[in-house]
């Protein structure tokens, strides 16, 4: 049974990767997020530290590289404007609708087949596929938050309903017992809980991005003055504040992703260990 658990987990992750390529909305959203955060990271790649140690330049030329970087970031304007917000909302609404619709279909199916245990199980199968789809999406969005900021994880995306439905069906084909049915019911309930938990994590990260923009706005407003005056103390102030804010962003992003990945590991692998008990 452990081998079966490993096999199913590998199949889920494989499907997640391919689904990301096939889903234009998700692919567009991920590309937009990566592009915007990469541009924002120009501040962190500022040559400020190197220029601070450089004694060959003096006067107005010492922080030329840092000033150029800061000016480019300011020229980018609103990286997370209406277009990005629309993409985020489209992905969220699409999967929330899938979750709600599949739940409704499950309930309707059970009403029509109250005495048919096998049909009832198929209803749970469909609902579980939708739940796992939503769950994997928010795990992936959490992972992406770290990818674009620290370039780490890019392994999980949204799986399609059909393959998951087929896999769960295959699991049930060899088991008609009440014990198996109860285990599956408990499994789906826990998946439902984790799906909602991951949605809340996604909202938290969105809030984190908004906080970053609020904090960085007054810093970018001082760039014009720094470029114009080219004063050493002004450049130092702008650069140090920018780097400090980005450090906070990276730290909080890592903590969020660790929570997401913890849920992912439990949901995609350890939940299936129900079959070993």
From Swiss-Prot:
Keywords: Membrane, Transmembrane, Transmembrane helix. One of its GO terms (cellular component) is membrane. The chain crosses the membrane at residues 124-144, 145-165. It comes from the Eukaryota. It is a multi-pass membrane protein. It is found in: Membrane. InterPro entries: DUF677. Belongs to the UPF0496 family. PANTHER family: (RAPE) HYPOTHETICAL PROTEIN, UPF0496 PROTEIN 3-RELATED. This is UPF0496 protein At3g48650. It comes from Arabidopsis thaliana.
């Amino acid at each position: 049974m452990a081998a079966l658990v490993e096999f199913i987990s590998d199949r889920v992750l494989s499907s997640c990767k391919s689904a990301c390529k096939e889903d234009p909305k998700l692919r567009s959203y991920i590309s937009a997020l990566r592009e915007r955060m990469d541009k924002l990271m120009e501040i962190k790649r500022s040559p400020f530290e190197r220029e601070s140690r450089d004694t060959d330049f003096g006067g107005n030329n010492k922080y030329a590289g840092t000033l150029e970087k800061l000016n480019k970031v300011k020229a980018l304007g609103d990286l997370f404007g209406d277009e990005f917000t629309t993409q985020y909302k489209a992905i969220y609404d699409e999967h929330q609708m899938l979750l709600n619709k599949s739940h409704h279909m499950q309930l309707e199916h059970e009403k029509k087949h109250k005495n048919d245990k096998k049909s009832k199980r198929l209803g749970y199968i469909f609902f579980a596929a939708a739940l796992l789809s939503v769950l994997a999406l928010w795990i992936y969005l959490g992972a992406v938050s770290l990818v674009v900021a620290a370039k780490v994880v890019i392994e999980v995306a949204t799986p399609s309903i059909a393959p998951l439905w087929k896999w769960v069906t295959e699991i049930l084909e060899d088991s008609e017992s009440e014990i198996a049915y109860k285990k599956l019911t408990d499994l789906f309930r826990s998946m439902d809980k984790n799906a909602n938990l991951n949605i809340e994590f996604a909202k938290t990260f969105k809030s984190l991005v908004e906080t970053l923009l609020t904090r960085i706005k007054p810093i970018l407003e001082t760039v014009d003055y720094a470029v114009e005056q080219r004063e050493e103390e002004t450049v130092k102030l702008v650069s140090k504040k920018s780097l400090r804010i980005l450090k906070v962003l990276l730290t909080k992003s890592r903590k969020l992703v660790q929570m997401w990945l913890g849920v992912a590991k439990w949901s995609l692998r350890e939940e299936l260990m129900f079959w070993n008990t």
